[in-house]
A protein has these predicted regions:
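Bacterial N-terminal signal peptides that target proteins for export
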Residues: 1-10
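Bacterial N-terminal signal peptides
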Residues: 9-18
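A well-ordered secondary-structure block
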Residues: 82-154
């Protein structure tokens, strides 16, 4: 009996030692590429790396799925809450939020387009935005990624 308790404890211990960024390790190849690309850009400007936020990823996934389904690239689709509403429904707390969306065949093209766009680039390099959730869903027109950034709520 004592050995079985030790075995159970030894089996469960690694679960509790998993870092909070583990969710980011379950990303698709395109999502991981977009996450890493944003952090490379931030690192090149001596900005802290973005931290993965699963609530943001849930909201991004729902929005990216809708964009892919309707074959539209818009910040708010018909019948959908605005960004603030989507994040609130996903359980995210924030004081500042931003969203980058696009459609293209691959993550390199998407990231390059975001970096060439002043508004999207500003979101990626904003030092006040410290967390991110990303979803990239394959649709008829290509990958429809949604990247949502936030600054945690101060309350």
């Amino acid at each position: 009996m004592r050995n079985s308790r030790f075995l159970l404890a030894a089996t469960l211990l690694p679960i509790f030692l998993i870092p909070s960024s583990f969710a980011a390790q379950r990303l698709s190849e395109n999502e991981r590429a977009l996450f890493d690309a944003a952090n490379r850009e931030r690192g090149a400007k001596s900005l802290p790396a973005l931290q993965w936020d699963e609530a943001l990823a849930v909201a991004a996934r729902k929005h990216a799925n809708r964009m892919a389904f309707y074959n539209l690239v818009e910040h708010q689709l018909s019948g959908e809450p605005d960004l603030e509403g989507r994040l609130t429904l996903a359980g995210a707390r924030f004081s500042i939020i931003a969203e980058n969306i696009a459609v293209a065949s691959n993550s390199e093209t998407i990231h390059a387009g975001w970096m060439d766009s002043p508004g999207h680039r500003r979101n990626i390099l904003n030092p006040n935005l410290t967390a991110v959730g990303i979803a990239a869903v394959r649709g008829a027109a290509g990958s429809s990624p949604c990247r949502i950034f936030r600054c945690p709520s101060r309350s």
